[in-house]
């Protein structure tokens, strides 16, 4: 049974006066407020494309009727033969990944046809705790974009293996779940904790079940008994798919799938698997998860996921159904996801079913965008609470080196950028510090939230190419500590101090110079600058990092830098405490295994 999200908003459609007006307009006894004519309706129930006109009263669809049979309306929108679809619903995403404010994000996606997002603000939660989630709830007020918040379940994502800016237990989750803006528990990344009935994670899941709200998952690599156990605990969705086979296994298991666009190289495999079925399961929804600012500016949000899926061979009707009706059913929102009398008038008119360029966008019956431009003002929110998150002093070059006795050591290494595994190598020691092994990349993490001493912990990566500079970032999932990658300690200190000096963000240094910087003074995650400005700076960063290391797609890519500290994933990961391994639950404070001489 679909969890029913207890939100206040759907009640606005139950106003007796509104319903009376809608009934009268549907009968022809009074005119519509808005009439969309001349369009081809995308029927996400039957899969048909059929001519139809849509009459709207207030926020409510009053009538879907024969073309040109009515002309009585205060406002007429001529669709001109274009395709009329329900507004797109993004079932799992993080606004912070686009490095802009919710207001700027709304301006970017609403004009493209996205009318609802399900936002997990766990980046703000990991930096600011409950205050960060409270700010997110305030920031979405009165936006033309409907944002359903989820309560961050993993703050931090790997307790005991990393330290962030807060620690959410079941009591805090229960309080968050009582807020009307909160639609459920966000992706549960501590999979082992759920499966092994860790009291903390069991309590968090139970808080979601008791609130009768969604309990969303992060089931990377789970299968067979572990997957069943994860679901039996109460988790009902997943977006962490790694192959077409994984997709099919999780569909058969009964999970709701949030098919994400952030791993483009996997989408053709997913499309092939769905096409083999011959129908679209009702449990397939779509999400963006993470979209970088330059990608958002150039490609868009969920509209880009729909566009790419169709390009890879998915039927447009299927892609739209996944992004509308299936999503609404997942959310328990019977007012959304369908163009039918009695439903909410969240509507987008697409030019065609290939490029999915939005000609008109209506949100709750109000025209909010036309021709890719917003028609309404978007309110902003005070950001004072998000400032001042860099609670650490400037770094010295020696802070990034590993101390050791002797002349030679055996080191533990973190091998491969994805699906990491333990490795070993030998290295020389000079002046009390380990000399980085040939071909290894240093990764250093420094706690920045004031919850522990800001001691830098350094490890060694293999398979990351040869670095002739450094990249520093405070966007480092999920605790968002100061993380620096590099080939030498001098450039690492330079990049780190540039980031500290701007109150958080990203910087690249090479040969003793800072070559690119993106200030993110809000939480060390977000800028209050316009999307266009942030996107340009991020593009410059991509280019600058590409000059200090040679990427090897699909796994050794710029994006890998932001997930290298994700300690909840299987395998060794560097954190502010050392090299952490979620399977053993242990942290290796120094990579030095043994002094050899």
From Swiss-Prot:
InterPro entries (UniProt xref): Adenine_deam, Adenine_deam_C, Amidohydro-rel, Metal-dep_hydrolase_composite, Metal_Hydrolase
Gene name, Swiss-Prot/TrEMBL: ade2
Source domain of life: Bacteria
The protein's Enzyme Commission number: 3.5.4.2
CDD domains assigned to the protein according to its UniProt record, in alphabetical order: AdeC
Catalysed reactions, as listed in the record: adenine + H2O + H(+) = hypoxanthine + NH4(+)
Top-level class of the enzyme under EC nomenclature: hydrolase
Family: Belongs to the metallo-dependent hydrolases superfamily. Adenine deaminase family.
Protein name listed in UniProt: Adenine deaminase 2
Protein keywords: Hydrolase, Manganese
Cofactor(s) the protein needs: Mn(2+)
GO molecular function, one term: adenine deaminase activity
GO biological process, alphabetically ordered: adenine catabolic process
């Amino acid at each position: 049974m679909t969890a029913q999200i207890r939100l206040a908003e759907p009640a606005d459609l139950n106003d007796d006066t509104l319903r009376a007006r809608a009934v009268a307009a549907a009968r022809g006894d009074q005119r519509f407020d808005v009439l969309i004519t001349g369009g081809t309706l995308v029927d996400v129930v039957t899969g048909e494309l059929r001519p139809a006109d849509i009459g709207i009263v207030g926020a409510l669809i009053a009538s879907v009727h024969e073309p040109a049979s009515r002309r009585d309306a205060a406002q007429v929108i001529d669709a001109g033969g274009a395709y009329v679809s329900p507004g797109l619903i993004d079932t799992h995403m993080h606004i912070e990944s686009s490095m802009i404010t919710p207001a700027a994000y709304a301006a970017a996606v609403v004009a493209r046809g996205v009318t609802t997002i399900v936002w997990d603000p766990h980046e703000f939660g990991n930096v600011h705790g409950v205050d960060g989630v409270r700010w997110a709830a305030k920031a979405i007020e009165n936006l033309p974009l409907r944002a359903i918040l989820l309560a961050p379940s993993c703050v931090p994502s790997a307790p005991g293996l990393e330290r962030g800016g807060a620690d959410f237990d079941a009591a805090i989750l229960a309080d968050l779940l009582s807020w009307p803006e909160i639609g459920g528990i966000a992706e549960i990344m501590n999979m082992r904790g759920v499966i092994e009935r860790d009291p903390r994670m069991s309590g968090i899941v139970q808080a979601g079940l008791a609130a009768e709200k969604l309990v969303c998952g992060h089931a990377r690599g789970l299968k067979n008994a572990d997957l069943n156990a994860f679901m039996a605990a109460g988790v009902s969705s997943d977006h962490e798919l790694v192959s077409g086979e994984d997709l099919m296994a999780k569909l058969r298991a009964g999970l709701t799938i949030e098919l994400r666009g952030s791993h483009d190289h996997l989408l053709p495999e997913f499309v092939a698997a769905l096409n083999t079925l011959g129908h679209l399961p009702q449990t397939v929804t779509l999400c963006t998860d993470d979209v970088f600012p330059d990608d958002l500016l150039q490609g868009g949000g969920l509209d880009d996921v729909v566009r790419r899926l169709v390009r890879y061979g998915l039927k447009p009707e299927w892609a739209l159904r996944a992004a509308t009706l299936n999503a609404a059913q997942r959310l328990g929102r019977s007012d959304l996801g369908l163009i039918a009398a009695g439903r909410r008038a969240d509507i987008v008119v697409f030019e065609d079913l290939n490029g999915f360029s939005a000609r008109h966008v209506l949100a709750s019956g109000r025209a909010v965008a036309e021709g890719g431009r917003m028609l309404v003002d978007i309110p902003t929110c005070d950001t004072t609470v998000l400032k001042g998150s860099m609670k650490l002093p400037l770094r010295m070059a020696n802070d990034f080196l590993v101390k050791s006795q002797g002349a030679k050591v055996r080191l533990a290494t973190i091998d491969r950028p994805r699906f990491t595994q333990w490795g070993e190598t030998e290295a020389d020691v000079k002046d009390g510090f380990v000399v980085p092994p040939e071909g290894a990349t240093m990764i250093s993490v420094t706690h920045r939230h004031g919850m522990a001493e800001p001691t830098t912990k350094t490890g060694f990566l293999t398979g990351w190419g040869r670095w002739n500079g450094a990249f520093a970032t405070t966007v480092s999932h999920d605790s968002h500590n100061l993380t620096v990658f590099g080939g030498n300690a001098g450039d690492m200190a330079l990049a780190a101090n540039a980031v500290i000096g701007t109150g958080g963000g990203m910087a690249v240094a090479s040969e003793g110079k800072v070559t690119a910087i993106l200030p993110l003074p809000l939480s060390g995650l977000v800028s209050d600058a316009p999307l266009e400005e942030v996107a340009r700076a991020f593009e410059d960063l991509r280019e600058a990092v590409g000059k200090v290391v040679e990427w090897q797609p699909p796994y050794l890519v710029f994006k890998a830098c932001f997930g290298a500290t994700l300690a909840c994933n299987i395998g060794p990961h560097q954190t502010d405490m050392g090299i952490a391994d979620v399977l053993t639950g242990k942290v290796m404070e120094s990579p030095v295994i043994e002094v050899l001489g």
